[in-house]
A protein has these predicted regions:
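Conserved N-terminal subdomain of the carbohydrate kinase-like
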Residues: 1-42
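Structural motif
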Residues: 2-3, 12-14, 43, 65, ...
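Alpha-helical scaffold segments in soluble metabolic enzymes
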Residues: 3, 58, 156
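Short, hinge-like loop/turn segments at secondary-structure boundaries
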Residues: 7-11, 83-87, 107-108, 132-135
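Active-site donor-binding loop signature of nucleotide-sugar glycosyltransferases
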Residues: 17-19, 91-93, 137-138
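Structured loop/turn residues at beta-strand edges in well-structured enzyme cores
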Residues: 36-39, 84, 111
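Conserved beta-alpha-beta core of the PfkB/ribokinase-like small-molecule kinase fold
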Residues: 42-107, 123-125
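Conserved phosphate-binding/catalytic region of the ribokinase-like
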Residues: 102-219
Length: 219
C-alpha cells in the first residue's frame, strides 16, 4: 500500500491512499503451517489495513497473543466482533477528549480485549494493562514529519513490556525485603519504563522523513 501526504509544520496530513492495494484484493489466508510458524513469537501484530479480520479467530484459538491496530476507526460493531480475539487493542484517538477516551477503553475491555494502547498525538498516550490505567506525556521535539509516531509508540511499548514481563515474578518468602518482590509491582514498573521508552522512540520517528527515512517527494 501507499499513502500520499502533505507535511504542514511537521504534521502529516493524509491526502488519500490506494486502500491497501493487493492485500485488500487478495487477503492472506492463514494455513496450519503459518499458525505453527507464528506460534514461535510472543505477539502477533496486525491492523485494520491488513484485511485479515476473518483470520483472527484462528490465531486466538491457537492460543496466540494478538495486538490489533484499529487506527482511528471507532466502529462499535467491529470492536464487538474482534475484541474477543485480541490480547491488545491499539487506537489513534487524538481527536477525542480524555473522558471520551476513557469510555472507549472501557468499551473495548467490556467487549473482551483486556489491554489497550491509545495514542493521542501531542497529548501523549494512555495504556490500560493488567487492570490499571497508565498515562504518558509526549517527549516533545522539533518534528520533521509525524508519520508513524503512533505506530512507533505502539511497537516500542509492546516489545519493551513483553521483554520485561518475562522476568516479573513473585519472590518466595525469604529473609529481607529489598527490591521488587511482587510480580504485580514489577509489572507496574515495566509498564511505566516501557511507556517512557516508547515516548522517546516515537519522538525520534518524528525527526525522520517518511517515518523511517525513506519518504519520497511526489510530483
Amino acid at each position: 500500500g501507499c499513502a500520499p501526504v502533505n507535511i504542514i509544520e511537521g504534521d502529516r496530513i493524509f491526502l488519500g491512499s490506494n486502500k491497501g492495494g493487493v492485500t485488500k484484493k487478495h487477503p492472506i489466508e492463514l494455513t496450519a503451517l503459518d499458525i505453527d510458524y507464528l506460534s514461535q513469537f510472543d505477539l502477533i501484530h496486525t491492523s485494520i489495513f491488513s484485511y485479515i479480520d476473518p483470520q483472527l479467530q484462528k490465531l486466538s484459538s491457537a492460543g496466540l497473543r494478538v495486538s490489533y491496530d484499529f487506527s482511528n476507526q471507532f466502529d462499535e460493531t467491529r470492536h464487538r466482533e474482534l475484541c474477543p480475539h485480541l490480547w491488545c487493542a491499539c487506537l489513534s484517538s487524538s481527536e477525542r477528549s480524555y473522558e471520551e477516551n476513557c469510555e472507549l477503553i472501557n468499551q473495548i475491555v467490556k467487549f473482551g480485549c483486556p489491554n489497550v494502547v491509545l495514542t493521542r498525538g501531542t497529548d501523549g498516550a494512555m495504556v490500560y494493562l493488567n487492570g490499571k490505567l497508565y498515562e504518558q506525556s509526549p517527549y516533545l521535539v522539533a518534528a520533521t514529519d509525524t508519520m508513524g509516531a503512533g505506530d512507533s509508540f505502539i511497537t516500542a511499548f509492546l516489545t519493551s513490556y513483553l521483554d520485561m514481563d518475562r522476568y516479573c515474578r513473585d519472590f518466595p518468602i525469604q529473609k529481607g525485603g529489598a527490591g521488587l518482590l511482587r510480580q504485580d509491582d514489577a509489572r507496574e514498573v515495566a509498564v511505566r519504563i516501557s511507556m517512557h521508552k516508547a515516548a522517546v522512540f516515537a519522538a525520534s520517528t518524528c525527526q525522520q522523513d517518511g517515518s523511517f527515512g525513506y519518504g519520497h517527494k511526489k510530483g
